[in-house]
A protein has these predicted regions:
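Soluble, non-transmembrane catalytic domains of enzymes that act on hydrophobic metabolites at membranes
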Residues: 49-52, 58-72, 153-154, 160, ...
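Conserved beta-strand hairpin/beta-sheet module of binuclear metal-dependent hydrolase folds
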Residues: 1-43, 175-187, 192
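Hydrophobic "anchor" residues on beta-strands that sit immediately upstream
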Residues: 22, 53, 76, 184, ...
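A cross-family glycoside hydrolase active-site/sugar-binding cleft signature
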Residues: 26, 80, 229
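Metallo-beta-lactamase
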Residues: 29-31, 135-140, 160-238
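Active-site HxH/HxHxD metal-binding segment of metal-dependent hydrolases
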Residues: 41-146
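Hydrophobic residues at beta-strand termini and immediately following loops
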Residues: 6, 25, 149-150, 166
Length: 243
C-alpha cells in the first residue's frame, strides 16, 4: 500500500495504491484535472484504475472535485453520512452554524487564509490544468454510483480502511484509518503545522466539545502516520498525545 500526497490549490489530496487499484481522498473544487493529471503522468496509471473517490467532509476544498473525477474514471463516489444534509447536521449540532461563523470570521483576517484563497499565482499554478478525460462523452453519461459512509464501515473495495466519524470541525467530518499500517487520513479534523513541527487543531470548527471527543477517539487508534487535509504529514509514536 502506497499513499501519494498531491498538493493542490486548496488542500491535500491523497492517492492510495492498494491491490492494483486506486483510492482517492479529498479532491478540491477545480482541482480534479490536476489530480487526474498526477495519476496519469506521475503514477502512470490508467484512469480506470481509480475505483473509489471519497471525501472527509463536504467543504468545497474537500468535496468539490470529487464527482467530476469519479465520473471521468467511472469510479464509485463515497461521502460521509451527514454530508450535503444541512437539516441533519443542524439537528445533531444546533450550535454549529454560529460557532462555525465565529471561528471562520476570526481566521479570515489571518495572512495564511488570504494566501490560500486569494493568491493569483496559486490559481495560475493549479487551476489551469485540465485533463481531457473529464470532457469525454462517456464520462458525462456515466451514472455515478454513490455511497454514504458511516462510522466503523469499511471502504468498498478497500477493506483495510475503516471510516471513523469525527465531528468537531463539522458534524459530517470523518477520518480514514488503515489498520495494517496504522495510517490515518484526517481531513480537517487535524492539520499539520510545519512551523510548529506537530499536528494541530483546526482554527475553524463548529463544536469544541465534539472536537475534543473526536481527538480522544483518534488517540485510541494509536496512528503511526497522520495525513492531514492541510499542511505537513507526521509520523512517529504517540503523535497525538500533545493534543
Amino acid at each position: 500500500m502506497n499513499i501519494h500526497l498531491v498538493k493542490t490549490r486548496y488542500s491535500n489530496t491523497y492517492v492510495i495504491e492498494e491491490h492494483g487499484k486506486l483510492l482517492v481522498a479529498d479532491v478540491a473544487m477545480r482541482c480534479d484535472g490536476f489530480v487526474l493529471d498526477f495519476i496519469v503522468r506521475e503514477l502512470k496509471h490508467k484512469v480506470s484504475s481509480v475505483a473509489l473517490v471519497v471525501c472527509t467532509h463536504d467543504d468545497p476544498d474537500h468535496i468539490g472535485g470529487g464527482t467530476p473525477l469519479a465520473r471521468a474514471c467511472h469510479a464509485i463516489a463515497a461521502i460521509p453520512h451527514a454530508s450535503k444534509r444541512p437539516t441533519l447536521k443542524f439537528y445533531r449540532n444546533p450550535i454549529g452554524p454560529m460557532v462555525k461563523i465565529a471561528t471562520t470570521f476570526g481566521e479570515a483576517f489571518r495572512s495564511r487564509s488570504r494566501n490560500m484563497y486569494m493568491n493569483k499565482e496559486r490559481n495560475r499554478r493549479y487551476e489551469h490544468i485540465h485533463n481531457h478525460h473529464l470532457d469525454e462523452p462517456a464520462a458525462q453519461r456515466f451514472v455515478l454510483p454513490k455511497l454514504r459512509l458511516i462510522d466503523k464501515a469499511r471502504l468498498d473495495g478497500f477493506p483495510n480502511w475503516e471510516v471513523v466519524h469525527t465531528p468537531g470541525h463539522s458534524w459530517d467530518s470523518i477520518c480514514l484509518f488503515h489498520h495494517p499500517t496504522a495510517s490515518l487520513i484526517t481531513g480537517d479534523t487535524l492539520l499539520g503545522s510545519g512551523s510548529k513541527g506537530r499536528l494541530v487543531h483546526p482554527a475553524i470548527y463548529d463544536n469544541p466539545v465534539a472536537m475534543r471527543r473526536s481527538v480522544e477517539k483518534l488517540r485510541r487508534l494509536k496512528p503511526r502516520t497522520v495525513y492531514p487535509g492541510h499542511g505537513s504529514i507526521f509520523s512517529g509514536d504517540d503523535i497525538l498525545n500533545h493534543l
